[in-house]
Amino acid sequence: MKCKILVADLDGTLTLSRNTYELSVEALLALRKARDSGLRVVLATANGLDFALTIARYLGVRDVIAENGCLIHLDGVTYELCSGDMSIVDKVIISTGAVIPSPQNRCRKYDMAYIPLVKDTLEKVRAVVGTGYIVESSGYAIHVRPAGVDKGVAVSWLCRKLDVSCHQVATVGDSDVDVGMLSIAWGIAVGNATEAAKKAARVVVEEPSGLGFKEAVNLILSGDACTP
């Protein structure tokens, strides 16, 4: 079965490493190679939609999954997979003193991002928000969003919308927030991915981050991905 769609994470996957925001030239060239081969490329990121669309424009990508699956921009139309008001829980989280809000939160709707200030931040935030919310780390920030949605849910929605089997979708990621999309499709984890991401993926490539993405694209274009 041939891959039809490539869903790529951004931070830690298209970057030089998992602790920088600098994009990898090798990853960008691989992304262009994938796009030019006929694959439909989708950017899947924890970032807010406005930021994601801006980055996507410069990457030559049209379709975006933003806020860890809460929002999807497909063929020029934005779809919301979440509902609710995050302002109250946002105030509760900030009141712990364990985090500071990301500047992007002003432009976010459902997935709120926070910079941790203390140890065990995940546990502290989970304790105050209770059930009904997902709290996890991307390696760049702590993310809090309504339960029931992640990148995997978004990829599944995308497949139904485009009438494509999830077996014909290759996903590439590096962190815990990518687990959903790595497990629901033909997942490829870069070499320096978290253990959870590696466990969820079908394949773990040797190279890290951007170089790993290049390796993943070569695997996909060779025909060795999206196989039974």
From Swiss-Prot:
Mg(2+) binds at D9, D11, D174, D178. GO terms for cellular component: cytosol. The active site is at D9. One of its GO terms (molecular function) is magnesium ion binding. Keywords: Carbohydrate metabolism, Hydrolase, Magnesium, Metal-binding. Its cofactor is Mg(2+). Pfam families: Hydrolase_3. Its EC number is 3.1.3.18. It catalyses: 2-phosphoglycolate + H2O = glycolate + phosphate. Substrate binds at K151. The keyword Transcription regulation does not apply. SUPFAM superfamilies: HAD-like. The keyword Signal does not apply. It is an enzyme of class 3 (hydrolase). HAMAP family: GPH_hydrolase_arch. Belongs to the archaeal SPP-like hydrolase family. Catalyzes the dephosphorylation of 2-phosphoglycolate. This is Phosphoglycolate phosphatase. It comes from Pyrobaculum islandicum (strain DSM 4184 / JCM 9189 / GEO3).
